[in-house]
A protein has these predicted regions:
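Conserved beta-sheet core of the metallophosphoesterase superfamily
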Residues: 67, 94-110, 119-220
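Core catalytic region of metal-dependent phosphoesterases/phosphodiesterases
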Residues: 1-104
Length: 221
């Protein structure tokens, strides 16, 4: 939560704050420490019930911190390939917990692509496990549920994760960004020699001009 607090403290006092979990918030998805689709063995050192409890506590506290600063908070909890089921119950948990909080909007759908239009700026999100980075503008532009927002936007910003290292691509009317992770390497990544700098981005968007500022937060531990 220290990184979340640092991110919130570093932002201007905007009317709207968006909390985006790009997926894989939970490393595994049930009582067995396996990826849900590929059944690949994952490294873990605790009971799933404890992981669930920590996930709920951290996300709840992050939402509470944001509600203290912003007039409205938008919450995105994207499906990841490691937490297909976990992303569902975490999203539902926050929606139910804050059912009487009109200042919180939870983007609650099972479709693993998510979007929010801020004036003429469209913000799009997908973990990156179903569509490659270069094809994401086509997915969001052609998907019927997003077509109207895409047409009414001057620019679209698409955010993905999955690969844990940074990339930026501007093409087809969109800027697509692949984000790093706050998580440290597990033994799988370490043994394969996979390295990337940990971090999270805090991006400020204007309703007309799109991105106007950004800050990178690096975890201290």
């Amino acid at each position: 939560l220290s990184s979340v607090k640092e991110m919130i403290d570093s932002t201007p006092k905007s009317k709207i704050g968006m909390l985006c979990n790009l997926g894989d918030f939970l490393h595994w998805d049930g009582l067995e420490q396996l990826t849900p689709s590929g059944k690949n063995l994952l490294e873990g050192d605790s009971r799933y019930s404890r992981i669930v409890d920590i996930a709920m506590t951290v996300m709840d506290e992050a939402v509470r911190m944001m509600l203290k600063k912003y007039e409205k908070v938008v919450f995105v909890c994207a499906e990841g390939n490691h937490d297909i089921a976990g992303s569902i119950w975490l999203r539902k948990f926050i929606r139910k917990l804050y059912a009487n909080e009109p200042r919180l909007e939870v983007i609650d759908n099972d479709f693993p692509y998510y979007a929010y239009r801020h004036g003429e700026t469209m913000l799009c999100f997908h973990h990156g496990h179903k569509a490659k980075m270069g094809s994401l503008p086509k997915v969001f532009a052609s998907e019927p549920r997003f077509r109207e927002d895409w047409g009414q936007s001057k620019i679209a910003y698409i955010h993905s994760g999955h690969y844990h290292h940074e990339r930026l691509l501007e093409d087809a009317g969109a800027i697509t960004e692949q984000h790093p992770t706050l998580a440290s390497r597990d033994s799988y990544a370490t043994r394969l020699g996979l390295m990337s700098q940990r971090g999270a981005k805090v991006i400020t968007y204007d309703a007309t001009d799109g991105e106007v500022a950004r800050i990178t937060v690096r975890p201290k531990t």
